[in-house]
């Protein structure tokens, strides 16, 4: 009905609509996920649904994730072509989820894909597309960060930073005087002695580079009923989701709410945003209201935060941030889903996409090959970095002394001393001391 007799009746109808919508989306995800191979008619139906102007972008993004998850179980050329088509969508969230699915499908099923000329032709076209090359480079770095670095960061949090914080018996946060202007000298001495500042600064730098520094924090917050549904691990964060809508303080743009901040934040992935909200809902309402009052407490602080929200909203639309959040969502699913042992964990694999024929042209592009090699070099993946530096020298940079020197250093580190000397000599020939 368009007219409601009471506000309570209206809320009841809205809740029922949200529930029906959620059920329909979940059923769509599950139907796609467990499907084997699409028939021509099923493929056509999927394309019609994806191109419909009546379907919300959030729902379509869940559909794209379902196709990707299905492909990771069994190869289907029609589903792969669906992802290739989905990548052309103008919405950033959709095309970034699609390219992640394309990359993973090529990684696991390259030999199968090469048997289909139409698919090969489409990939070759993309490999010459500047935007695709840039997007794929970001996906590659983010997959490497998740598969190779997140576990190290998690270990550092559990074994170094958190235990160090717990060592200080005087760190009584409940006894803090918010109005005190002076710093506690005992705390400052402990901070200097413990080296905690350096560790936190290192984590901050890792976060700025796109590393997943919140896995350790949020891994304990995936026990809520919400996460029992497999599709929910791939939900884009939506403040109107039925169970968290009550946290909203309305649509007043002049107000700063916790949901506004979460919605625009590029720091937390979608899964962690839901975890945060469900944790908030377990708090007494008085504490939630107090947090809200603190956000809106001081006018100057509020204005500054509003500006920050604008900046976050703009950066949120950038493909790099969208794909990073999605990769983090994938990582949490494969590491934390209650039935994760029934499926293959993709993040236990090397995920070296650049070694795949279908993707190497884009990832070894002259504008990105050195960036990829530098990433591997700085993260001590020396053998792979050395191979890429060699490839870069061979293809584009035979007169680049710095690359010869970096490659020489790598061969020295891994014990190939004769080769290292040859590379150092070549570097000296190009730029003699």
Task: Give the ranges of each region predicted by the language model.
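Extended repeat-based scaffolds of very large eukaryotic assembly and lipid-transport proteins
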Residues: 1-66
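Generic helix N-cap/helix-start motif at coil->alpha-helix transitions
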Residues: 18-26, 55-64, 76-77, 91-97, ...
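Non-catalytic protein-protein interaction scaffold segments in large eukaryotic complex-forming proteins
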Residues: 132-305
